[in-house]
Design a protein with these regions (language model features):
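Alpha-helical interface subdomain recognition
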Residues: 1, 8-11, 23-28, 35, ...
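Well-ordered alpha-helical segments within folded domains of soluble proteins
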Residues: 12-17
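A short, Trp-centered hydrophobic/proline-enriched beta-strand micro-motif
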Residues: 39-47
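Flexible, small-/acidic-enriched active-site or ligand-binding loops
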Residues: 58, 106-135
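A short core secondary-structure module
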Residues: 60, 69, 73-113
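A short, charged helix-loop
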Residues: 127-153
Length: 300
């Protein structure tokens, strides 16, 4: 598995299909969701901008009402699937506040570019797109998306999935290191027979189990409809840290061979650098938890 593939699926489901399902009209759901579920229509989620990442409420993208249509101008950056998407979920500022729009990527004035030379999530297409007087009809506005809370709710859905994906990363790194050490002789016995390495395996397994339990608890909260954003922030923050620590430890347990593309831990470590950044950085999730604990929003 690879976090790049999980990112593609996460964007398609949590960031594109979810807002249509939750905030869209019945006509929009019928038009877009079947094709997206079948993989025949690819979506991307346009929230992050070149100058606005952790503070989406300051976004510069604007949508202006002109009769029965909207005119969109602005740019979005670090967008998964940009360049291959058929439809973009675009979040923009309007005179009435934040709104969401369905923007076909073949619209006149819409241009997407792929971001090159990434060292992370190389299996995922990442890009940016620009809108220069892009026109969409009123029927392409998500009617129930009427505040910044709408895109943030989509991020909560994606973060929920990340909490589980991070456990998969840790497990693959654990298994890769264990297989390697069981078969690698050194000083007349396998690397896995040395005390220091057994302790490292015990530490990875313990933290991985803790992360898995937290993800399972998150799932139960979601099924009970009692899940709240700070629950998701805690799991995303914790489990991503567990995953990247497991990847780095596993890489080190393979010695120089660990930097080879033959083995997965270093690839996972590179990918997790991105995963720890998108859908809210580790620090932002710490502040979300801090607000829940103290009642004081430190970032406002």
């Amino acid at each position: 598995g690879d976090s790049g593939l999980r990112s593609f699926v996460s964007v398609q489901g949590s960031l594109c299909m979810f807002p249509i399902w939750k905030y869209g009209s019945e006509e929009q759901k019928e038009q877009w969701l079947p094709g997206m579920a079948a993989g025949e229509i690819i979506g991307c989620f346009g929230l992050t901008e070149p100058d606005h990442g952790s503070d989406p409420s300051s976004m510069a993208t604007r949508a202006k009402k002109d009769g029965d249509r909207w005119i969109l101008n602005g740019s979005k950056r670090w967008i998964t699937n940009a360049g291959i998407a058929d439809i973009a979920i675009v979040w923009a500022n309007t005179d009435e506040g934040f709104r969401g729009f369905l923007v076909p990527t073949d619209s006149e004035g819409f241009e997407a570019r792929k971001i090159q030379n990434k060292l992370s999530l190389r299996a995922s297409v990442t890009g940016e797109f620009y809108m220069d007087d892009v026109e969409v009809p009123e029927s392409m506005r998500l009617p129930d998306a009427i505040s910044i809370g709408a895109p943030l709710s989509c991020l909560s859905e994606a973060r929920y999935g990340i909490a589980f994906g991070a456990v998969g990363v840790a497990r693959d790194c654990y298994n890769a290191a264990l297989d390697y050490q069981q078969e690698r002789p050194q000083f007349g016995k396998s690397l896995s027979s040395f005390q220091i390495n057994q302790i490292k395996f015990a530490d990875i397994l313990t933290e991985m189990t803790n992360a898995n339990l937290q993800a399972m608890s998150l799932g139960r909260l979601k099924e009970d409809h009692s899940i709240r954003p700070h629950h998701i922030s805690m799991a995303k923050r914790h489990n991503c840290r567990v995953a990247i620590d497991a990847a780095r430890t596993a890489r080190a347990m393979m010695g120089a061979n660990g930097v080879s593309t033959e083995y997965s831990p270093m690839r996972h470590a590179n990918n997790m650098e991105s995963v720890m950044t998108y859908e809210g950085t580790e620090e932002i999730h710490g502040l979300i938890l801090g607000q829940e604990i103290t009642g004081i929003p430190s970032f406002r």
